[in-house]
Regions:
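Conserved GNAT-fold acetyl-CoA-binding loop/helix
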Residues: 20-49
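A short helix-loop-beta-strand connector motif used in the catalytic cores of GNAT acetyltransferases and
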Residues: 44-61, 161-164
Length: 172
């Protein structure tokens, strides 16, 4: 059983570093696991703090039995039973062992235990394999899209034009 707990400010820099490694450093990883459509960082300290300042925002960390940081996820309680999932991250050297599925299930259970009725997220539309991974876990595309934040390098630098996000949702 995965025990998620609220991250402390002292853990933010480690969380940022792991997120950027997992999302943006393709060395030794298969393409679907990294955002090769976007260069640069995935998150920085100012963006993380801005996100966590939003009402209902939580940054949850998962440490293994030895205390090693294994993964983390950001969840936002958007009210009325809706939760938003972002930055689901498993330490790159621990991927391919089902830990992503385990962390996702723990995040869903966390939201459900707090009245969550549905989980939403956004995924870059062009990342078909990642969308498929979430669809195999019960998420569906809602038909809604959101624009990619071109020009805001806090999210990274797109390597091509035309990126946007699909909104995915799952009943909890």
């Amino acid at each position: 059983m995965v025990e998620l707990r609220e991250a402390t400010e002292a853990e933010y820099l480690d969380i940022i570093a792991m997120t950027n490694r997992a999302f943006r450093e393709p060395a030794g990883q298969v393409d679907w696991k990294v955002e090769t459509l976007i260069d640069g960082q995935r998150v920085d300290e100012s963006l993380l703090r801005q996100d966590l300042a939003e009402p209902g925002a939580r940054l949850l960390i998962w440490r293994d039995a030895a205390g090693a940081h294994t993964g983390h996820v950001r969840l936002d309680d958007d009210g009325d039973g809706a939760w938003y999932l972002a930055m689901l991250t498993v330490r790159p050297d621990r991927q391919d062992g089902g830990l992503g599925r385990t962390l996702l299930a723990a995040a869903e259970a966390f939201a459900r235990a707090r009245g969550g009725k549905r989980m939403r997220m956004t995924v870059v539309h062009q990342r078909r394999e990642l969308i498929g991974w979430y669809e195999r876990r019960g998420y569906t595309r809602t038909g809604e899209t959101e624009p990619f934040p071109y020009g805001d390098d806090r999210f990274g630098r797109p390597t091509q034009a035309g990126l946007y996000f699909d909104v995915l949702e799952k009943a909890l």
